[in-house]
Structures are given as C-alpha cells and as structure tokens.
Amino acid sequence: MDRFIIHGGHRLRGDIVIGGAKNAALKLLVAGLLTSERLVLRNVPRIADITTMRRLLEQHGVTVEDLEGDGGTLAVGGTITNTEAPYDIVSQMRASILVLGPLLARCGEARVSLPGGCAIGTRPVDMHLKGLEALGAEISLENGYINARAPRGLVGERIILPFASVGATENLLMASCLARGRTEIINAAREPEIADLVACLNGMGARITGTGTGSLAIEGVEALHGTTHRVMPDRIECGTYACAAGITGGELRLIGGRADHLGAVVRALEEAGVEVFQEDDALRVRRTGALRGVDIMTEPYPGFPTDMQAQFMALLSVAEGASMVTETIFENRFMHVPELNRMGARINVHGSSAIIRGVHSLSGAPVMATDLRASFSLILAGLAAHGETILSRVYHLDRGYEAVEQKLARCGAQIERVRE
C-alpha cells in the first residue's frame, strides 16, 4: 500500500485548481442510467471512486467513454443489459446504492448489494427503501441484497423524509423523474451537489422545481434524453485546502472555489483567524496571525458539513484556547482523533463531541488513515508538524482527492508518495 512521507513546517503559498466535485460527479454518472441517449460530463475528477462507479455502470451494460483520454470528460450511454449491482463493486463505495432508483424506474427491477464505502457508523439505507416503496416499489432484503420490483412502474407520491438525507433525496429524485404523475420530496437535502444534479436532470428533460428550498417537486416524464453538463467545483476539496493555508500560516489561491458553497466553513475559518476573500474565479485564503479556538457543530446544508469536520479539527488542534466539535450527522466519525493525539494533539471525545485544547505545535509521527476525510486531516497535521510524518493507507485519500501530493508540492509542501 502507498504511503505519504511529509516533512512539516513549511508555509503553503501558490495556486491550487479545485477539481470537479466527487459528491456531484458520482450521482451525475448514475443519472446516465435514466436515458438511452448519451450523457456527456465535463470536469470529472480523476479519483478512485469515479473508477469504481465506471466499473459499476459497465456492469449494467452501459458504456462509459473517456472522450479526451485523461478521464476529465466522460460520456455515459447505451442499453442496460443487467440490473444487478454485485457485492464486489458495491462494497467498495457507498454511493453505489444510488443505482437502485434509476434501475427501478427505467427497467422495473433491480438487485443491489447493500453498500460499503467509508467505515463511518451504520449509515442505514432505510429512507431510500421506504421512499421507493411509497412510489410503488416492492422491496425485500435477502442474503445481503436489496431486491426491488415495480412491475407496473413507479407512481408519484408525497414523501416526507424524517431527516434531510442527501443519498435518499438523490435516489428518490432520480427515480421520480420517470414515475407517473407528480412526486413531492419534503425535507429534501439542499446541498449544492443536489442542485447540480437537478440542473443536469432538467437539462435531460426532467421537470423538477424547488431547488434549494427543502421541498422538491417532480413531474414525471415518459423518457429523458442526453445532454452535456459540467460538474460543479468540489467545495469539500476547496475547504480542505483552505484549512491547509490556515494550519501552515500560508496563503493559497483556490481556483474555482466558491464562497457561496462554503458559507458555514468560511464563517468558521474567519472566526478562527483565517482570512477568506472571494475573487472573480477563485477563493483567496491566508493567515497572518494566531489561530483561535472555535466551536463547530456539523449539520445538514447550509450548516457546517460533516465532510469538513476532521480537517477542521486538525486546524483547531494548534489553535489558541479550547474548541468543541460536535458531530450530529454520523456516529463513529472521530476515528482520526487517536492519530492526531499521536502527533501531540490534546483531544478528548465525549459521546458525539470532541474537546480540543490547542497546543503550540505538533510532532511528526507514523499515523494511519481510517477513512477519506480523516486521511486529509492527518496530512494537514503533518504539514504543520515538526519533523517527519508517515501516513499509511492513503488509498482512502485516493478515493476522493485528485493529485494531492502534486498540488501541495507546487505550493511548497514537502510531501512524497512512496509506492509499495
């Protein structure tokens, strides 16, 4: 397995191009299952999860063509010949569950393995299944698989989600596009990635209104057609590199970054002593003074994103004073804490909250990544630490971040990937 070797203590300065959003691109690829025509996606991130999703779509019989030879522009199209999503692929990535709704809507049946992905709590799929049942699907669980049928097709219904689940919103949204009649999704998630999915689906001929309001209305259509769509910039990647500027006391220009996608993160950064400026095509982030402790609580959008919690905790570990981080979205999302403490951080976990008492400096140490976002929190700590940090199991990082070592090295970081 690959490792990163990081020698910390260097201020980062320079430009970093923010790639396409992982959490948008995966769902946009799945949307290709809703039409027999070609869906062309531009600004696709070159990450491991995209490779896994391509394998899954090809398993269903559709073609995923690399139009420019570098993975950045993909075309999805063709006939669905297989409605089973097998365990060996689905277990690698939780987003695989999102093929369930489109397969059911388009083919009237689907057999999808229960999902895998990051080891963050149980992350149940109950809301996906209950919502599809409300649309008329017949669903059973057998031997680790979801068996779903809609022999008479899906029919629009009013669905109230008990929690603003991103995945359930996306699955039901895509399924409803081809359902008969009108579907309403109440308490729908409002993330920018969902707005990006809606824009693409409407470009394919769907009739969806209510983006960003928490209540989506979908008028079903008989068929969708192809289109060309550009994937939005990755707000989590942008927020992560903003933390890199903050923790190293440097200045980065994050090309493609948008403050309007990162409101809660920008406010927390500014409260912590990091300056953030929106320029025409970029976000400029810099720190010149001391970091200050702040309290944050993860919440559904537009609240502070759970996918930024680990990175922000690394930043707070070297801030003056005490901070508290409360995780309300996922259980078991503090697995990075013991590794940060190995580097000299002072963090104590109490239930769903972590108390961080800032230290003057961190020390390099051998550490191990446990999930996608936690892996980057350890890189951030390594960039700020004295001495050498060796980060193992970086395959977690490769699932969601593109060209990490190259982007950081161009801005002055001493980071090297060692392949084994």
Curated annotation (Swiss-Prot):
Question: Coiled-coil annotation: which residues?
Answer: none
- Give the GO cellular component terms, alphabetically: cytoplasm
**Reactions it catalyzes:** phosphoenolpyruvate + UDP-N-acetyl-alpha-D-glucosamine = UDP-N-acetyl-3-O-(1-carboxyvinyl)-alpha-D-glucosamine + phosphate
Q: Where does UDP-N-acetyl-alpha-D-glucosamine bind?
A: R94, D307, I329
Q: Which NCBIfam families match?
A: murA, PRK09369.1
Its annotated function is as follows: Cell wall formation. Adds enolpyruvyl to UDP-N-acetylglucosamine.
Q: Which family does it belong to?
A: Belongs to the EPSP synthase family. MurA subfamily.
Recorded protein name is UDP-N-acetylglucosamine 1-carboxyvinyltransferase
Taxonomic source organism: Gluconacetobacter diazotrophicus (strain ATCC 49037 / DSM 5601 / CCUG 37298 / CIP 103539 / LMG 7603 / PAl5)
